[in-house]
Amino acid sequence: MEDPKSDEKFDIGISEKNLDVGFGESSSVDVPVKGRFASFLKKLELSSGPEKENIDLRPTPPDRRHYSALDIIYLWSCNGISASAFRTGTSYMEMGLSPKQALAALIAGNVFIAMPMTLNGLFGSHYHIPFAVQSRASFGYYFNTLIILLRFIAGLFYYGTNVYTGAECVQTILYAIFKSFRSYKNRLPADAGITSDFLISYFVYWVISFPFHLIRPEYLQRFFLIKSISTYIACFAMLIFLLCNVGSHVVWDQPATVSGRSWSWVFMCALNSSVAGFSTLAVNVNDFTRYVKHPKTPYVQMLILPLVAAVSAPIGIVSGVASKIMYGTAMWDPLQIANNWTSRGGRAAAFFMGLTYLVSMIAQNISDNTVAAANDLLYFFPRYLDIRRAQVIVIIIGAWAIVPWKILQNGTAFLAFLGSLSIFLGPAAGIFVADKFKNHHKYDIDEFYNPSGIYRYNKLGLNWRALIAFLCACVPLIPGMAMSINPSITMPDGVIHLYYIGYFYSFMTAFLIYWGLNLVFPAKETLLEEAVYPPKSNAELVDPSTLSGKDKFWYYIDY
């Protein structure tokens, strides 16, 4: 086994041989072409030192840890109040729940998902490494590639669908500024899946959002603050407008349309959906918590996630019910409501509503999708990609190559597949949490970068305990996933009901099996007496027991 303290301790596991595949002597490409291509690749290499260390895969140094507890609050509060988040509560009402029941499902789901997000987030706040590197400890030095690919695929497609929502924001702005834009002539064929005016809106959104993806994640906290404040102001303004027109009792007195045993399973399905909505973040939350100043900062997620659901979900529910009364159609999207404001004053309000949600969608897409997908992508190409280059690739592929408007228009089966990815990400989150308890949160930061170290487990770089736990958790849910993708497939009620609680089942099953296997067959080399951490920041060197009064209060707020 290699010495983890050697000069190669921060090698990320991609060898020179692996990086140069196709350029060896066995290559059939002629020498001139090979030479030009090799020269081109050489120019693309990052200038990160003689050892080709990628700083975005290395532990975040103290001088790049800028996030405080308030910044984490801004980060997640801006997600819960976005335009896409508003649709969730109303979709549960369409399933048959009453407004109060839909709200209860959302809050309960956020309470549950806050636990794995906090526990996995603590890994990032202590060891300051991205999810892609962290996963080596649980799945093995090479088997973690499976989970990274799943997360990358999810982030790529979710980015594209969110760009579509961002385009709706731009469309609302253009409708408000240019009255004639509503009747803009469509010059695209019907099978294009998109109209000319919306394609313009789509392109404008992508161009506006592009520069924000060039900002390194550790410097985005002020952007999240601005977004949170502006969006909450806009949301409460719309809430007041709707309630003044229809009254609060009309909204909350709506009855459920299902009852008995059917209601129970509909409620469980809604509860599972509210949890699964955060399934990607529960896996890769440390892509952001790696930038926090203090190791205890992620604990604020236990409070902020349920609180955001309790504040934002009622606004979406009110929008759906009130819009049906006012306009004759239930509009679960605040942008659709704003598009009905056609008077001079109404268009001004619609402009500010669209602008607010435009900023909101840019922030949400960064925090939910592009940073995570970029971290996953640069993991495979560490010599050539940093977080900025990787984000540029993600936003080009996600916005244009996968053609998200086609998916949203005709891709019902594919959207069902995207929604079912939580049955694979749930086991990953469960295994991460179980691994944290199994190791008593003691890891060796150097070993994460040692290809022959303790987190390799065997010659294959595979932790078989994680493989068994993963398969036991997700395989029983695959028939239900197949049914959701292709409704013509018939399944027994038991299979359907198991799929309705898929995230709960997959998370808990993976957690218990992985925990049990490690009790019976422990990987003793990974059980450390003392943890090995990266260098500590100034915040970590302060002993809060020596502080009192307002100094202690601001210590926890600022750090």
UniProtKB/Swiss-Prot annotation:
InterPro entries: Pur-cyt_permease, Uracil/uridine/allantoin_perm. One of its GO terms (molecular function) is nucleobase transmembrane transporter activity. CDD domains: SLC-NCS1sbd_NRT1-like. Pfam families: Transp_cyt_pur (PF02133). It comes from the Eukaryota. Keywords: Golgi apparatus, Membrane, Transmembrane, Transmembrane helix. One of its GO terms (cellular component) is plasma membrane. GO terms for biological process: amine transport; nucleobase transport. It is found in: Golgi apparatus membrane. The chain crosses the membrane at residues 103-123, 139-159, 192-212, 223-243, 263-283, 302-322, 348-368, 387-407, 413-434, 466-486, 501-521. It is a multi-pass membrane protein. Belongs to the purine-cytosine permease (2.A.39) family. This is Uncharacterized permease C1683.05. It comes from Schizosaccharomyces pombe (strain 972 / ATCC 24843).
